[in-house]
């Protein structure tokens, strides 16, 4: 009876759990059904236990069944160890999902899983209690999952969580509700059952919750992007550091190989010197033995042998002394090199380090006349132009080994100088003018080219200590304080290379004063030198004057020539015009130059007589009583009277023009 009751309880529990998973809206009913089944199953198990314990008759029969129970319990206790962890994980994930998107669905799935697990636990307990179960019970147990197994829903949820983690950056914010702040149909039905106030309050709470979740989602997204950027930057920094380390390792290996080569060469030189010393010692011992043998025999020696031996001994002594000196100097040089190169000093490895002691053309232009120029410049580096290649300028890194004076005086910016720099690039040395120095910094390719030249020449690179010292000397030169003597030297240096003095008159007066003082002191040589300077100054002034007035005189000559030519041409034009006027016919439309003459002042006697006759006929003969007498007399005798009468008539213009004209039409 107990076995049948347990089987029936298990059969009731399984469909209830399946209904819980399948129906989205039947959460409460499913949970109630499962709790009722649990209570009934518990009661059945307890009753069966009490009945089994109370009956003493079937103890012998139940002993083997108890052994089977222990075995099955020991087998089934091992897998459930992982089950609580999974359930706890699901519970924590569910609790976290309440603050993330898709929380309602996960809750329902979690409840369904819990109900399934409880049902299976109780089924297996009933299975162990009842030893003689039927085939139906075994089929039901085989259909349900065991405690150690993971269901498909769990695996799907784990895979979906991993996918959500991987694609969390691409996902958009979703809190389980739509744009109208409502969920599925069940949620809509529940909101419809509420009052309007409760519904508004619920929607307001959901809005606040959505804002909080949005902020958290954006913060997480920003943090993830920031972490990604940091990782990328760290990777870049690590790659750059690795590249720098590789470069330094390569340079160190080159330096070490170079040092090994130098040491091997020094060892070879020392071996050669030691061999030569041993040979000299052996020769001396042989000569000593010879002299001892000769003295023992007491034979007279020839002069040639004696002198030749002495000369040879002297030569040998000199050669031995020279070899000793050379060995001492070489050893002293090695000791000095060892002292100069401390163990902590490192050679230059970057162009930025060498740029600290680089001199530009602007600095050289400022310092070329300074008293500290040669001392400060030696040991510094410059970027010198050596020519063009494929129409592009080529530059090299070179070290300044000295300052010399060239034969050519050239223009350097605003000053003139004849100084040149003795530069060294590897084994090559050459003198360059200051105007070929560049103002730009060293490039990486130029720096590597210089290093290769130094290594091939077997020369050592400058150390950082030397660069620091030279940098300090450059700073001291920039902050140099001049005294009176320095200023006088600078002025003399600048005057040496000036083509002409700034003021010829002042220079001439100064030279004349110096000449007068020299003549007073009786120094004729100095007076002669000053006179030569004066003559040279006069020649320069005359040359400048000629050069200045050269263009002016040429222009004035051209102007005078043009004036003379214009005069000649104008005279020719006047002659031609007068000739044309004579031969030209009268043209009434041409304008002519003429002066107007008054009709009354005309000198024609016939016209004048006609006018007088008309006037007498009109106004009577008493108007002009003297007219016939004047007409009868000669024109030359009575000019004054005639002019007076004419002037009287001309004055009364109204009378002159007061006459009638008859026109017949």
Curated annotation (Swiss-Prot):
Q: Which PROSITE patterns match?
A: PLUS3
Instruction: Report the superkingdom from the record.
Output: Eukaryota
Q: Which residues carry this modification: Phosphothreonine?
A: 50
According to the UniProt entry, which residue ranges have a biased composition of type Basic and acidic residues? 187-208, 236-246, 264-286, 627-642
Sorted alphabetically, the Gene Ontology cellular component annotations on this record are:
Cdc73/Paf1 complex
Basic residues: which segments have biased composition? Answer: 105-125, 223-235
Modified residue annotations for Phosphoserine: 48, 621, 645, 650
Q: What are the recorded GO MF terms, alphabetically?
A: RNA polymerase II C-terminal domain phosphoserine binding; single-stranded DNA binding
Q: Name one GO biological process term.
A: transcription elongation by RNA polymerase II
Determine if Lipid biosynthesis is one of this entry's keywords: no
The UniProt regions of compositional bias labelled Gly residues, in chain numbering, are 19-28
Q: Specify the Plus3 domain's residue ranges.
A: 348-479
> What positions belong to coiled-coil segments?
521-555
Q: Which Gene3D superfamilies match?
A: Plus-3 domain (3.90.70.200)
**Record region (Disordered):** 1-208, 223-352, 622-647
Q: What are the Low complexity biased-composition ranges?
A: 1-14, 153-165
Residue spans with biased composition (Acidic residues)?
A: 48-60, 307-318
Q: Where in the cell is it found?
A: Nucleus, Nucleoplasm
User: Which key words tag this protein in UniProt?
Assistant: Activator, Coiled coil, DNA-binding, Nucleus, Phosphoprotein, Transcription, Transcription regulation, Wnt signaling pathway
Per the record, the domain comment is: The Plus3 domain mediates single-stranded DNA-binding.
What functional role does this protein have?
A: Component of the PAF1 complex (PAF1C) which has multiple functions during transcription by RNA polymerase II and is implicated in regulation of development and maintenance of embryonic stem cell pluripotency. PAF1C associates with RNA polymerase II through interaction with POLR2A CTD non-phosphorylated and 'Ser-2'- and 'Ser-5'-phosphorylated forms and is involved in transcriptional elongation, acting both independently and synergistically with TCEA1 and in cooperation with the DSIF complex and HTATSF1. PAF1C is required for transcription of Hox and Wnt target genes.
Quaternary structure (record): Component of the PAF1 complex, which consists of CDC73, PAF1, LEO1, CTR9, RTF1 and WDR61. The PAF1 complex interacts with PHF5A.
Entry protein name: RNA polymerase-associated protein RTF1 homolog
Q: Which gene encodes it?
A: RTF1
